[in-house]
A protein has these predicted regions:
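Thiamine diphosphate
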Residues: 1-127
Length: 130
């Protein structure tokens, strides 16, 4: 029996993006200055021309993803869950959900702590969910 290698879900996400990138040339990945934490950096190394770092601007990232989708791209917008659901809510609702735009949102770090990837005071965690 082979032993299963245990890895973080976010690492699986980064690896899955690379596999999808092999299959779909129109796939692009966006992140909000979190390529290391969300593991989109794995995709960035494999396909640097199809990765966009939007900086610490989640709302803007969602708008960019929506725009890219209208040109035939399949964008994966990736950030911490708190910022995808909180900071970028209006853009997700108005620019992606209402017009039914084909944007995939990858939200990591959805628990009550972001561990080694965030401030100890919890600004990047999803404590409201508790």
């Amino acid at each position: 029996m082979s032993e299963v290698k245990k890895i973080a879900t976010r690492e699986s996400y980064g690896n899955a993006l690379v596999e999808l990138g092999k299959k779909y040339e129109n796939l692009v990945v966006l992140d909000a200055d979190l390529a290391g934490a969300t593991k989109t950096g794995i995709f960035q190394k494999a396909y640097p021309e199809r990765h966009i770092d939007c900086g610490i601007a989640e709302s803007n990232m969602m708008g960019i993803a929506a725009g890219l989708s209208t040109t035939g791209k399949v964008p994966f917008a990736s950030t911490f869950a708190m910022f995808a659901a909180g900071r970028a809510f209006e853009q997700v609702r108005n620019s992606i959900a209402y017009p039914k735009i084909n944007v995939k949102i990858g939200a990591t770090h959805g628990g009550i702590s972001v561990g080694e990837d965030g401030a100890k005071i919890g600004r990047a965690s999803c404590r409201e969910r508790v």
